[in-house]
Amino acid sequence: QYLQREFSKIYSGIGGNEPNSQIRLTLGDTRTIQVNIMGEVSVPGTYSLSAFSTVFHALYRAGGVNKIGSLRGIKLVRNGKTIENLDVYEFIMKGKMNDDIRLQEGDVIIVNPYESLVEIVGKVKRPMYYEMKPTETVANLLEYAGGFTGDSYKKAIRLIRKSGREHQVFNVDEMDYSVFRLDDGDLVTVDAVLDRFENKVEISGAVY
């Protein structure tokens, strides 16, 4: 419609309510660009990609991020300057693709090792390892894990932290979920709700 509208300004037969001419557009061979993919990917190197390719396309061609690669801060360098830090979690968790911009000739994609990996187990919907940013908290981790299951104890979680010499154990209350920050190697456990009643009353004898 855009092309038809623009061409109709020059060729009268294309526009109007009853046009007597048509536009047929065929896309031929697309231009290719050279992009360098470095760091923690399966197959780092220089790749020839379509000029319509984005960072996600390039990572796919390189075999994806390896076991120690970061998904939270993938750098796109253009003309010696970092122009984007791509957070794959924004796409996986929220469906946002704002950072997945189109690549240009000579772009460099750098995948650094992750900084913080935390495991959450127990009564959450997606128990597994998650990469966390330095400012993220227990609340962020619970969001990534899909939230509590129906039989979980939601008032507190247990956290085991490896300090380098010994293990530290924390009981984090619900009110602190949004402020308690996580460290690399933390283990968070969400227990099941206790098999008891909070407000149980027992009545015995002759009751009328």
Protein language model annotation of sequence segments:
Residues 1-208:
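Ser/Thr/Pro/Gly-biased, low-complexity, turn-/loop-rich segments
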